[in-house]
C-alpha cells in the first residue's frame, strides 16, 4: 500500500471530470440573498452549532461576506452567536438599503455584480468605511470582460487596502472563518480554521496577463512563499501571499500560515477525490495550492515541503484511506499534520516544477486549458483508476485465513525476514483455558463385590508436592475463569445426593423431612456470607432433592451459625445429612500425615453428627493410602454404602466421600472400584499436568521458546506484493509457517504517522510439526491485505480466547491425540489419509519424517510445492471410486470424520461401504488402519443438539439435521470386518475419561468448559475409531457376546512367554502382570501361557461392562495393541404388568404393578423436565423391592394424564443413562366419574386448574381460601413434586387444564 510519509493512500485514482462554470450574481438575486430572513446557509454557516443552547463559536463565510477582514475591535470583543445573527442581519439589510438607494432595483435588477468589487464594498461597509468608490464600479459585463479586467480599467489606489494597476489588483484576503465568543482552539472538537479567521491572513494579487504574473512574482521573490491555484482560481488568476509568522494550535512545533494553507488545500483535494463523481460538476478538479516562489523542493524537512509533495499526487486523484471529514476539527488537522510529519518517504513519481504541475495521462484528471499542467509518465506508478468506499474501522483485530500462491522462498530467507520484523519478546496475556463448568466422576465403592487390600491401593504420587507440579497446578487454577469454585463443587455433589438411593429399597436416602448440617460453612463468597449452594437447597431448585426441614451451619468462618473446631468432639444434635466441606490443609498444610489425621478426625465428627439411616459427606484433600487404611479400620461399620465423587474444577486430588445409610453394623470395605477410582483420579491429574507443561507461566515474556505462545511480525506501511518477494511478503510467509493458520490475526493501527500493521498467530507444538516438514516456505496471496484500509483495535496477544470450544472440537482433539500417538510407530513408512480436508491438518499431527499421501475431493489449500514430494503428496479425488486407487500405495491409512459422509454420498449403508473400502486399502499395501465409524459402542442413546439417532432409517442426524450419515451396530460391523480380515487385530478407541488427550486442547491454546468433557466422551462412544492391524493376530474371545459376571476366555497369540499383559478400561489398567502374577481390579482373572499354542490364556470374570483394550509388552519394546473385547451389560428390557382397569385404586392406598427387568439395573420413577430426568415424590410413585421381585407402587392423580412418568435406571452418574421406560399405561388412564379422585400440581413450576362441566371449579396454582364443597386437603401429598399439596375431590366429571 502506498504512503506519503505517514499518509496512507488507496491505490485507486478518482476525480471529478466536469468543472462548473462561474456564474456572476445578478443584482436582484444579490438583494434576495441579503434580505433573507435567515442568513445561515446564505452568507455563512455555523460549523459547531449546538441546537440545545443555540450556540456556536466558529462561522464559515460565503460571498460576499468572505471578503471581509474584520476591524481589530471586532476580533478583540467577539460576539456570541445570538448577537452575531442579529448583527449580520441588521448590517445586511442596511447594506441593501445603501445599494438600492444608489441603484434602484427596477432599472438594475438584471445587471451582474463584480464579485471582487462587491466583496470589498461589503467588507468596508461592515467596518464602517466609505464604499462610494466600490459602488461606482459595482457592475460589469461578464460577456465582454472578466472581474479583473473590469477593475484594471481604473488603475489607481481605490482604498488603502484595494490597489489597482493596469494589469493587477492587490487586496487583502477576507476571513473565510469568523470566531465568536467561546472559541477555543485547544479543544479537539473545535472546527479548524487553518488561520483563515485572522484578518489579512494573506494578501491576494490578481493578474490579468502572464507578463503581469511574472512581474508580480519578481517583486515577491525575496519574500515568503507565494501560493497559487492553477485550476479555476476563484474570480480569476491570482497569487496568494500568506502572512508571515506562525499559527498556533495545530502542532507541537511552529507552523507557518503558508504551510497551513497548503495542508488545507491538500485535505480538501483528498476529500474531493474520495467523493468525486463523473455526474457531478465541481468548481475545480485540482484543489491543491502550488508554491511558485521562495520554495525549496530538494528536501522534505518542513510541513510545506511535505504537503507540496503530497499535493502533486493528489492532482492525479489519489484518495486517503482515512476519510477526511467535511468539517475537520482541530484534532483531525493535528492528526493529519502529525502523520504528514512522521517517518516515511515522499512520493517520487511526480517531481516538482515551479510553474507547472505534472499529471499522468491515464488518470481521470482533466487538465484545464493553459500552460500550467503537463502530461508525465512516471515509472512503476502503482495506481489504477477507480473509486474507493471508506469502510468503517473494525472494533477488533481481524481474522486472516492464509491462501497461497505458486511461489516459495527458502527457509533461510523466511527466517531472515522474520528476524527483521518479529515482535519479540512479547508480553502476552493468558486469558482462561477453562471457561467454567465441572467434570464429575462418581464411583460406587461399596457396590463392587470384589475386595481390594487397602495396603495395595495406589497412593498419592511421590512428586505431587514437587515445586514444578505445584506451580503447574497453581497455573491451571489461575487459568480458570473467575467463579465460586466451592459453589460449583457443592452443586455437583448435591446433584448426586439427589439421585442417591438405598440399594435395598431403591428409595431416596434423603426423605422429605431430613435436616442438614453444613460443616465448614464460610462467609468468604462474592455475593453471600454463607455457602452459595444453601440458597439453591432452600429454594428446592436442585432437581430431586427435597427441601431440608432445617439447615445448621458450623465452622471457622461461619456467620449464620456456630464457631466450631470440627476435628474435635462437638456438642450438637444429629442430622439426616451432614455435609463437611472441610479443608485439611487449613490445619495441616502439605504435611500429609497431619492432613490424614485431620481428615480421619473430621470424618469421625461427621459420622457422629449423622442420624441413623442418614448421609455423611466429607471432602478429603489428599485421599492417601494411609487415609483409606484408617477409614476401613475405624469406620467400616458406620455406613451401608460408600461413594466417591470427584468434581474436577482444578487439578487437585480432592474428592468427596459419601457415606449412606448411617448405622453401627455396616460392612464397608476397600474394593477394586476404589482402586479404579484412584487410578483414574491420578491419571487425570497427570494428564492435566502434562497439558499445562505447554503453557508458559504468568509474567514470562514470550521469546518464542515455549510450546504455546504468540508469534508476531510488525510492519510499517508495508507494500505487500504478489509479484516479487519483498520483506513484508517474506515476513508474512515466515509467520504463517510458524503458527496455526486458523489463529492468524491482522491489525492496522495509526502510529504517529505511519500505519502499524501487526500480523500474529498462535504457536503450538502442532504448528512446529508442520513447519518442520516444510522444505521451502510458501508465499501468500496478499490481495485481501492490500485491500484493507480500515483501522482496527490494537493487537491483543492472548493465548486463550474467551469462548470454550464446542464438544465436536474436543472429540476431534482427542482423536488428533490418538492418531498422533499411533503414527509415532517407527514401523510405519507411508500413511494414506483419506478425507484429509483442504487445510491438511494431518501434517500437524504426524512426524515430519513420515511419508504421507493426503486425499480429498476438494482442492488442497496448502501449497504442495513447499513440501518434499518424496514425503508429502495430495491427491484430489473421490476415494469411494475404484479409479481413485490406481497407483495409490501405502502401508497404513487413516479416515477420521469422513467415512459416514462418504457412505451417505455414495448412497450405501456403512457396513457395505467399509466392506468395499478395506480391500482397496489392503490392495494398496495397507496393513494398519484407523477408521472412525458411526457406531454406538455402548447405549444407543442420542445426544441432544449433537447427534440424534434415527433407529428406523439407521442414520445419525448431526447438529439438528445439518448432516445425515448412516450408522451400523458394532457387532455386525466388527463381524463383517473380521470376515474380510480374519487374521487382523481389531481395537476400538474412544475418548478416555482420564483426559490423556487434553494436551491437544489446553496445550494448543483452546479453552474448554469442563462440563463438556463427559458429553465429548459420550459423543466419541457414538463415533469411535476402529484400529485394524493385519500384522497382529486377533484376540479370540469366548463366548461372544461376553456377558457381565460370567467367566470368559481370551486367547492372545504371542511368541514371547515373558511378555507383560495390560488390559485397560477407560484409560486405566485394570488387569496387568504375567502368568502367576496377574492383578485385576475388574473381576477375577487368571493368566497362563500355553507354549504349545504360543498364546496367553486370560480367564476373566468381569464385574464391569464396557470395552477392554489388550496390550502386550516385550522387554525393551513399546506396548503393542492386541485388540479389544466388549463386556456387555444385561439387556435393558422392561416389562410392566399393570393391574386390570377395574381393580385400580384411586385413594392414597395406591396400586402395584410388577416390574420385569434384570436386577443389574436399579430403577427409580422420574419425569423428564428441562432436559433431564428428575426423581418424583416417592409417595407419588416408587420402586418397591419384594424379594425376589420388584413392583412399581403408584398413587393416581388427575395430573397423570398430563405428566408422563418414566422408569429410569439409577447409576452414580445420574438417572436414565441406559433405561428410560415411559409408563404410558398410567398416562392413558381414564379416571372414573363415580369415585373420589385426587388432584395435584403437575410438576415444579407448573400451574393447573380444574373445570367441571366446562365451568371453573378450582385453581390448583392459587387454591381458594375456602375450598369447594366436598374438596379436602389430603393429609399426604402424592404430588409429583414433594412441596405441592394434594386435594381429594368428590366424585364428578373434571377437566384438568395445564396453565
From Swiss-Prot:
Reactions catalysed, as given in the entry: a 5'-end diphospho-ribonucleoside in mRNA + GTP + H(+) = a 5'-end (5'-triphosphoguanosine)-ribonucleoside in mRNA + diphosphate; a 5'-end (5'-triphosphoguanosine)-ribonucleoside in mRNA + S-adenosyl-L-methionine = a 5'-end (N(7)-methyl 5'-triphosphoguanosine)-ribonucleoside in mRNA + S-adenosyl-L-homocysteine
GO CC, any one term: viral outer capsid
S-adenosyl-L-methionine listed as a keyword: yes
Subcellular location: Virion
EC number: 2.7.7.50, 2.1.1.56
The UniProt record lists the keyword GTP-binding: yes
Record's keyword terms, sorted: ATP-binding, Capsid protein, GTP-binding, Methyltransferase, mRNA capping, mRNA processing, Multifunctional enzyme, Nucleotide-binding, Outer capsid protein, S-adenosyl-L-methionine, Transferase, Virion
Single GO molecular function: mRNA 5'-cap (guanine-N7-)-methyltransferase activity
Biological function: Outer capsid protein involved in mRNA capping. Catalyzes the last 3 enzymatic activities for formation of the 5' cap structure on the viral plus-strand transcripts, namely the RNA guanylyltransferase, RNA-7N- and RNA-2'O-methyltransferase activities.
Membership in a protein family: Belongs to the aquareoviridae outer capsid VP1 protein family.
Protein's name in the database: Outer capsid protein VP1
Organism: Aquareovirus C (isolate Golden shiner/USA/GSRV/1977) (AQRV-C)
Gene: S1
